[in-house]
Amino acid sequence: MRDVQSERDERNVPLKHVGIKNLKYPVVVLDKKNKNQHTIAEINMYVDLPKDFRGTHMSRFLEVLNKFHLKIDPKNIKAILDDLKKTLKAQSASIEIMFPYFLQKKAPVTKIESYMEYKCGFKAYDTNEECEFYIVVEVPIQTLCPCSKEISKYNAHNQRALARIEVETSELIWFEDLIELAESSASVPLFTLLKRPDEKYVTEKAYENPKFVEDVARDIALSLKENKKIRWFKVEVESFESIHNHNAYACVNSDTMEV
């Protein structure tokens, strides 16, 4: 049977990334409290393609992924990339995995437990020289505007925001620890279930702890800078403004911080 993908391409244009994108796939990830958590990931997998090959073999990406029996952790991700390079005869391989991650969270006053959803994941890029591994968390939080509080007699505008943390590391860093860092840097964390005493606490806590997105980004960055496991990091904070028809945004990475 004719193998069109392997035929020679005369245009002599190498491609940096070819592969599959937005694959929905069941996975098992490490959970700090419960050891494992089942979830559904969205996965991108790529390899490079030499200038003289017409196309890659898309089915082989799934064949490689299926070998690992749904288990996704830092050790397996390195093995997946090695297998991709070997199977597809590539010089480089990369994978991006994002998934909903759930933690049981107690309301601040009543202590009623409910599940809180976060978006977490891994990114890894493997070339012949080295393998770069990243952990990603996206944490919903709340911010209350310091300026609004200062100039207003009765209240201050507040809103949900999203803190996104990406760290490069060669060691295990728990999602839970990065999530806790983001929440502790906000005006107040978010909760799925709140009774009236909890709602009173959250409202007053935010008012007592006003923060700009710039404040949140800087506080997270300073804490990440102290973590010796982290080689590089990037922090993004986006606030979904309640009184504006636009969002507020702040970003910092370790390259731009003073040593």
Swiss-Prot record:
Keywords carried by this UniProt record: Hydrolase
EC number: 3.5.4.16
GO molecular function terms noted in the UniProt entry: GTP cyclohydrolase I activity
Keyword flag Hydrolase: yes
Enzyme's top EC category: hydrolase
Catalysis performed (reactions): GTP + H2O = 7,8-dihydroneopterin 3'-triphosphate + formate + H(+)
Hydrolase keyword on record: yes
Pathway stated in the Swiss-Prot or TrEMBL entry: Cofactor biosynthesis; 7,8-dihydroneopterin triphosphate biosynthesis; 7,8-dihydroneopterin triphosphate from GTP: step 1/1
Site description May be catalytically important, residues in chain: C145
Highest taxon, organism lineage: Bacteria
Stored PANTHER family: GTP CYCLOHYDROLASE MPTA (PTHR36445:SF1)
Official protein name in the record: GTP cyclohydrolase FolE2
Gene: folE2
